[in-house]
From Swiss-Prot:
The keyword Protein transport does not apply. It comes from Postia placenta (strain ATCC 44394 / Madison 698-R). Pathway: Secondary metabolite biosynthesis. This is Cytochrome P450 monooxygenase 88. Its EC number is 1.-.-.-. Keywords: Glycoprotein, Heme, Iron, Membrane, Metal-binding, Monooxygenase, Oxidoreductase, Transmembrane, Transmembrane helix. It is an enzyme of class 1 (oxidoreductase). Glycans are attached at N25, N198. The keyword Metal-binding applies. Its cofactor is heme. Cytochrome P450 monooxygenase that is able to use 4-ethoxybenzoic acid as a substrate for oxidation. Its main location: membrane.
């Protein structure tokens, strides 16, 4: 008798849940942006590979904003520039939250990863700390260090062009290790701590892929014994690494020997900032995680574009010859006189965006757009790949055309933007340091070399890793020096 009662109660509960799902689906479907049909209960199947490309195809079919369902999760994907402005910028206050990320944030990161921290006081605390060290005035102080490392990048390409992607990783690691931890000696892409941090980033990227872990759709799985135990192991390994780096700075501070760094700033202001030791370690690690991964990828994309579009490369070099000449190397002081360099960088950002699929936002209130309603609680993805191919904003989007960023006077346009650093209140606080890195490396490498493809091994410009931040797969380049006595002129030897 008891078993019959229990069975009846469970059956009734299940029936009620199914009816609730059906009613919710019918109610929301009337107001949501359109989208591909899915299973009545489980919704749409997550894409197996390169979700941003799949979503771009759906944009062509369903329009600037479309809706997907994963279980009870509602996901609205934006694939056009104006829709991104209307929803994620004009409604930034209502769309700056992050959806719950159980696998990547709660299990792997103890809830401390800035990228996935929900809107609220904790996020404000984290961003205040980051902004103090990465705002434009602070970022400008890193230019001498970035310039030194950019010269080494050029010399590395001169001596060993076959490993140009590794040299980009070395540059990025050296810069962010200096900013984050005050490390002044050269950092190699093969240093153990760099390899371990990059391994952690790869694990994070895998956990962030849509549909990677069922726990993100059914959070109760988090409490099942043994579920995703490898994610907990990853967390302990990463926390041990970033804590070790932070403690090394503590020891130097205690001796009065610590150079300026973000970690030193956090330690000296820890009580005022109200951050725990674990939060401090993750904040410092965020500098490396965000800066190293994205900068290395962007440098690879820049050289790929130069090789594949020699006419665009030649335009930059003509201006470099006119403004700088070949008797000295370009510097940051030349930036205002080199709009062709800036335009080349901006087009590289657009042509192959590093954060191709973007990171999910979450609506905290209903957002009305073009007669549709994105309901509170829905996830919103600004798909950078599709937005970068908006033909109304970027005509002939598959072409690499830096000239689109210049006005009739040859100056950089103020009326054309791209959202490669994110949207609204979630824009990347490290964008100024990143822009500085891309400008000076592009200026120096195109001043120093004519970059071309290997005729025996043409570049596949769509061959990228299937990760949260995409990287070009290995490709061959030829670096032909344009400048005599390059090493002497750069005033530095390869390190």
């Amino acid at each position: 008798m008891f078993l019959q009662i229990v069975t009846s109660v469970l059956a009734t509960g299940l029936l009620y849940a199914l009816i609730s799902v059906l009613q919710q689906n019918r109610t929301l479907s009337a107001s949501l942006p359109p989208g591909p049909p899915g299973h009545w209960l489980f919704g749409n199947a997550p894409p197996k590979a390169f979700p941003y490309r799949h979503f771009a195809e759906l944009t062509e079919t369903y329009g600037p904003v479309f809706t997907l369902r994963f279980g009870r999760r509602i996901v609205c994907v934006i694939g056009r520039y104006q829709a991104a402005v209307d929803i994620l910028m004009k409604h930034s206050a209502e769309t700056s939250d992050r959806p719950r990320s159980v696998a990547a944030n709660e299990i792997m990161s103890k809830g401390h990863r800035v990228l996935m921290t929900p809107a609220g006081e904790r996020l404000k605390k984290y961003r205040r700390a980051l902004h103090a060290f990465l705002q434009p005035s602070s970022s400008a102080t890193y230019k001498p260090m970035q310039y030194k490392n950019a010269k080494n990048y050029v010399l590395d390409c001169l001596h060993d062009g076959g490993h140009h992607l590794d040299h980009g990783r070395k540059y990025a690691a050296s810069v962010v290790m200096s900013v984050a931890y005050g490390k002044t000696t050269p950092t190699s892409y093969s240093d153990p701590e760099v390899l371990q941090i990059n391994k952690s980033l790869a694990r994070l990227g895998a956990a962030l892929k849509p549909g990677a872990y069922l726990v993100d759709t059914y959070p109760i799985l988090k409490y099942c014994p043994g579920y995703a135990s490898h994610l907990r192991r990853y967390r302990e390994e990463e926390l041990a690494l970033i804590t070790k780096q932070a403690n090394a700075v503590r020891e130097l501070l205690a001796k009065g020997e610590a150079p300026p760094s973000f970690t030193a700033y956090l330690i000296e202001n820890q009580e005022r900032l109200g951050i725990s030791d674990d939060e401090l370690a993750y904040l410092s690690g965020a500098i490396f995680g965000a800066g190293s991964d994205t900068t290395a990828a962007a440098l690879g994309i820049m050289t790929m574009a130069a090789a594949c579009y020699p006419e665009a490369q030649a335009r930059v070099q003509a201006q470099l010859d006119e403004v700088v000449g070949r008797d000295r190397a370009p510097t940051f002081e030349d930036e205002d006189l080199l709009p062709e360099v800036t335009a080349f960088v901006l087009e590289a950002y657009r042509w192959r965006p590093v954060s191709a699929g973007g990171f999910s936002h979450r609506a905290t209130k209903d957002v009305v757009w073009n007669g549709y309603v994105i309901p509170a609680g829905a996830e919103i993805i600004g798909n950078h790949w599709a937005i970068s191919r908006d033909p109304e904003v970027y005509p002939n989007p598959e072409d690499f055309k830096p000239a689109r960023w210049l006005n009739e006077h040859g100056r950089v346009r103020n009326d054309l933007k791209f959202t490669n650093f994110g949207f609204g209140r979630r824009v990347c606080v490290g964008q100024h340091v990143a822009d500085q890195s891309l400008f000076i490396n592009t200026a120096l490498v195109l001043w120093a070399f004519i970059i071309s493809q290997d005729a025996q091994c043409p570049i596949d410009t769509y061959a990228f890793t299937d990760t949260a931040n995409v990287h070009p797969l290995p490709f061959s380049l030829h670096f032909e020096p344009r400048v005599k006595d390059m090493e002497a002129m750069l005033g530095a030897q390869a390190e």
